[in-house]
């Protein structure tokens, strides 16, 4: 662990939460998009996070894996996935994207985006971003105090 590892870990959190906020913003912006370039309605996106881990120097053949999780180096975005939950149906036969035949005739498929859920996720991501920012500021303050002690 280096001197700036706390700042490095928190900066990975800042980057991950910024991307999460971008994806949530994209979901909110497309809450009523009934047709995308792919042809169907917009599908909600979500981010999958994974830990950034380095193998520790003490890892050996005699240490069981469950005792050794590695050295944490923050978080990374593993993927951005489309939500497979069912789309919303709204009856609107005058809509240009309404279904023209079958049992769902006159219905329009709308995105599976729940605005309330997105706003809750946005607040959560904002708070996590703020927490990571606080970690960076606290680390900088500790470094300043340590330098002041060393300077006498």
Swiss-Prot record:
PROSITE patterns: FLAGELLA_BB_ROD. It holds the Pfam family Flg_bbr_C. It is found in: Bacterial flagellum basal body. The keyword Translocase does not apply. One of its GO terms (biological process) is bacterial-type flagellum-dependent swarming motility. Transmembrane segments: none annotated. GO terms for cellular component: bacterial-type flagellum basal body, rod. Keywords: Bacterial flagellum. InterPro entries: Flag_bb_rod_N, Flagellar_basal_body_rod_CS, Flg_bb/hook_C_dom, FlgC. Belongs to the flagella basal body rod proteins family. NCBIfam families: FlgC. PANTHER family: FLAGELLAR BASAL-BODY ROD PROTEIN FLGC, FLAGELLAR PROTEIN. The basal body constitutes a major portion of the flagellar organelle and consists of four rings (L,P,S, and M) mounted on a central rod. The rod consists of about 26 subunits of FlgG in the distal portion, and FlgB, FlgC and FlgF are thought to build up the proximal portion of the rod with about 6 subunits each. This is Flagellar basal-body rod protein FlgC. It comes from Borreliella burgdorferi (strain ATCC 35210 / DSM 4680 / CIP 102532 / B31). The gene is flgC.
């Amino acid at each position: 662990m280096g001197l700036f590892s706390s700042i490095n870990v928190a900066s990975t959190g800042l980057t991950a939460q910024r991307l999460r906020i971008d994806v949530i913003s994209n979901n909110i912006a497309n809450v009523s998009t009934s047709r995308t370039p792919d042809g169907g309605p917009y599908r909600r996106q979500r981010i999958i996070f994974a830990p950034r881990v380095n193998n520790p120097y003490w890892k050996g053949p005699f240490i069981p894996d469950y005792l050794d999780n590695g050295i944490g180096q923050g978080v990374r975005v593993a993927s951005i996935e489309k939500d497979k939950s069912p789309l919303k149906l709204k009856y609107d036969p005058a809509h240009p994207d309404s279904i023209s035949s079958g049992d769902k005739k006159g219905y329009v498929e709308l995105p599976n985006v729940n605005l309330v859920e997105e706003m809750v996720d946005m607040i959560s991501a904002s708070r996590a971003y703020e927490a990571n920012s606080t970690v960076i500021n606290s680390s900088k303050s500790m470094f300043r105090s340590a330098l002041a002690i060393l300077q006498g």
